[in-house]
Structures are given as C-alpha cells and as structure tokens.
Amino acid sequence: MSYFDISGAVFNNQLRELETSDPAHADVFNAVFRQLINNDVALMEAASMFAGEKNKQAEFILNLKRTGKKYGVHHSAFDVSPLSAGTRTLDAVGMVAQPSTNTVRGRNDFEGESVFYGLEVNGHVDDAGEFIVEYIKGIDNEFSRTERDTWMLYLTQWINITIDANGESLVISDEHHAGFFPEGAAIRTDQTVRPFVAQAKYMAGNGSDGKAASISGVNAAHDQSHNGMITRFKAKGTQYCGTTAQDKNHMDNLFEVAFATRDSQSIMSGCTGYYNRFYATVVENNVERIIISKSDANNLVVGSTVSIGNATALSGSNPTDDRGNAGLHAKANRVIITKIEDYDSNNSAVYVDNGGTKFSTGSTMVGSTEVKTTIVTMPWHTGACDNVLGSCGSPNSNTSGKDPYILFGVEMFLGFYEVISNVILKISNHVMTACICYDCTKLATSVTSDYVECGYSIADTQESWKYISELGYDPENPSVRHGTKVAASSSTGYADGQYTNKLDQTSDGLREWLSGGYLSSWSLAGRWCAYLAAGLGYSWWSFAARLSASGRCAKAAA
C-alpha cells in the first residue's frame, strides 16, 4: 500500500479517480482492490467509504476475497484405500494448511482467501430469516465479542460432489460454476441464494437478558437436548434455532478441503480427552484454590475450566465423578484456572477465579464414606481461542486432547457434544434414517410433514462404538451425512465413531443427533463423530449448541 495514502478523503478520492477515469474495466479495479486484502486498515477504510449500509459493507469486504477458484480434495473409497488422507485437486494443489496456537502461527495458505475468509461481525437474524449486520470488527468501535452476538460471515460456498466406486471428490468455490450447487445455509425460503452465510462464532451461552447468545467469556449453556433447544432458542425469536445440519456441513467442507484429511483429530483434536478428577491433598479454609499432588496438577491446563466440590453420591463404594452430580460443583462451579504454582516439594496449588467466593477444601461424608474435595475438568468457557494467532488452531496444543479449537474463526470442541437442532433420527421397522426440517419455525418434537427423509439408511452399530468408513449422501439433502459403513479404525477412514442402539431389536422411535464428542470421547471424537442413541428429550451436562442463522432455508435453489 505504499502507493496509496489510506487516510480518509485522500484514499477515497484516489480510488474514485481510478473508477471515473476508466469505468469500463472492472477487472483493473478488482486487481487494485485485491491489493487491499493484505492490509486490514486499508480494507476496512475502503469498505466504509464505498458502502454505507452494514450488509453492503460486509459484502464489499467479502467480494474482495472472491477468487472464482475451485478448491478440491479427493478421498479414495475405503475398500480402495483406507487412508484418511486425501489428495488436493484443482486450485488447492500445492497449498498448505497448518493450525496455529497462542504463540506459534502456522502456515495456512487458505486463510484470508475466498470461502475460507471469515469476517467477524455483530448482528442478528430478522423475522424473515435474513442476517443483519450491526457492527464490523475493525470498522466500528461499537463492535464487541462480549456484549453482542458475534458471528463469522463467509462467501457462499458453491459445491460439487462426485461419488463413484473409486471414492469421493469435493470441490468448493465462491462462484457458480457448471455442475455446482449452493450450500444449504445460503438458500433463502424463496429459493434465491444469499451472497454470504453467517456462523455463530461461539457456542451459545446466556446473554444479559438470559437468552441464548454467541458471546465470549461465558459458560456455554449445558444440559441441552433436541426438544429443549426448540423452546430455548425460540425465546430469542422464532427465526432462531440451535446448530443446524447446514451449519455443520459448511464447516466440515472447509476443514476437509483445507486440511485434506478426514481424520480431523490428527490436525486439531479439540477438548476430547480431558476427563480428570483429582483429590485435595491438603485441607485449607477460606481459599480460592485447591492443593493437589504435583503429578496430578501437571495434567491441568491454565485457562481451562474446572469445578471444585464434594460428591454427594457413590459409584459402587467410591465417590462418583459424574459431572451431573451437583456436589462436584458446590464450591466452585465451572470456573477458570488462573495459575498453578508449587506449594511444597510434593504438591501444587491450583488457583481458580471463583468471583471472590472463598471455600474450604475439607472432606464430607456420604453415609460412612469419607468424600474428599475434588477438582474435576469441565468444558472450556467460550472465547478460549480468542488469542490464537491464526484463523485455525488451539490455545496451547492442537493435538493434546485438552484444548478446544477455532476453524476459520469459529470456536468449537470446547468439551461438549453439539446438538443438531433440525434433524431427527427416525427408527422404523428396525431401520434408522435421518429427517431434516428446513424451516426452524416448524421444528417439532416428532417427525411431522415439515420434515424430509434422507434417502439412505444409517449403519447399525449394535450398541457399540464403531468407526465410520463411509458416509451416506443424498443429493436432495446434501447437508445431512451419517455413517452407512463402519469398518474403519481410529486412524483410517473418517477415524470417528458412530453409536446406535441395537436397531434389529429396537422398537420404532426417535433419536437426537449428538455431534463431535465430549471431554471423554478420546479417539472416537472428531468432526464426523455421532452419538445416535439418545431420545429427543435427553439432556446431559456435556450437551450444548450454538445459535444458527440458517434455520429458515429452502431445500434447494431455484
């Protein structure tokens, strides 16, 4: 930008001069504008000068990222090659994607380009289901991650999927090429296509009004269920719902193309192996810390979330470690570890932010059994990844199993299953199929005429975890994908687990879609992990969701 003065009217006049002197050559101006892309100050300055209304400003910025390129990946069919790694195709050939941390920025050639670029904004969904931008990060001083719903905006994905005996090829682009279709989240109810789609940046906590909110620095609301979410999210407005299949599919496409593997945990594992309980070794009073052995403390991560308390029930003869037990949270409920320091040669002090409320780390009794004060790991607060240096990555380690991650700006895998709001799994005559509703105002606690059944059967895993080797695909409902074959392992195929009832022995019924895994899923977890054996009203401490802006869509574009 050494050739442009980007200050106020000077920058404005220079670009206007170019525009008026040669109005017929848009390609020239696009080339100039694209040089702004790597200069955030200039980019935001240009947006505010050339577009007044916020949605137009957002479109202006996103359109500068438009390349028209086709980014692809090919994966062999499992019986051709069980390898999880794919082969980059078309314009993705030669590109590199590496996740970052808070201290190391990985190389990511996709970052900031085309459909992979995310614009961070505050906004809301209007009554018609359209996303309205309120404030844009970098332009508006009013922008806030903590006080207003925060979203990532992306250019609409145009998708081409080819599946044959050799495998599956996925191609995404920011332009409509022959044979491509728009992603589900972008299709309006009138079948026109939105220029961009919005993804909630954070799992949904509660805002100051007590309603679902996509904000940083809070506990995501837990104990969610398919049925419970209908009520919870509609309290914000009938145009809202929890995470949709379209939301999930959007992010899955970005991951699969950018990182060219189906084994998502090999790149970023998320908080999927951080299920710990440690006992106090020294009793203290009037403190906001707990003393535990050094070896135990070495397993904990500063910045992560824990609870401190005494179990009020036993599991066999021992105190329960089920996080659903209220006693485990009675002294410090889902609080952040602020520091860990040596206490003596054998023990460490783990400090937490309990808002100034002090507690004792003494024992209690359950019957005749002594129950020591314990510290248990819990899902992270939202905003845990706010300091990651790139658009993808984890705070400390991408593959330890202890950290959540962001994927092109969207934070996920805090330690919760993510409940999908607009899909119901139906068991009929011992066969499970997925049914999707494209209008969140019509979400129901049963499969009604507003739901569309997908055209494939889901693999019966016989009440055991099995690893997905092939996902079903219905071109009429392309956002909904579940395992139809489960012959893989933790390091082959999709490398993610799927769980169903014994369908051959199960009566007709309905199940919710729990996606991704939780604190204790370990190698079963990942982008395609699915627990499909819980009823629609079943909730648990490890179930959460995010706001969706794609609740009101059509099945297909005109």
Where are these regions (language model features)?
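C-terminal, surface-exposed recognition/capping segments
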Residues: 61-63, 69-71, 75-80, 337, ...
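Extracellular "spike/adhesin" assembly and maturation modules
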Residues: 1-49
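Carbohydrate-recognition beta-sandwich/jelly-roll modules
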Residues: 101, 143, 149-191, 196, ...
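Short aromatic-cysteine micro-motif
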Residues: 141, 145-147, 179-311, 323-413
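Hydrophobic beta-strand signal
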Residues: 16, 307, 418-419
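A short, polar/charged loop-to-alpha-helix boundary motif
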Residues: 427-439
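Acidic glycine-/aspartate-rich tracts in secreted/extracellular proteins
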Residues: 42, 157-159, 203-204, 247, ...
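GGW-centered surface loops in extracellular recognition modules
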Residues: 54-153, 161, 300, 350, ...
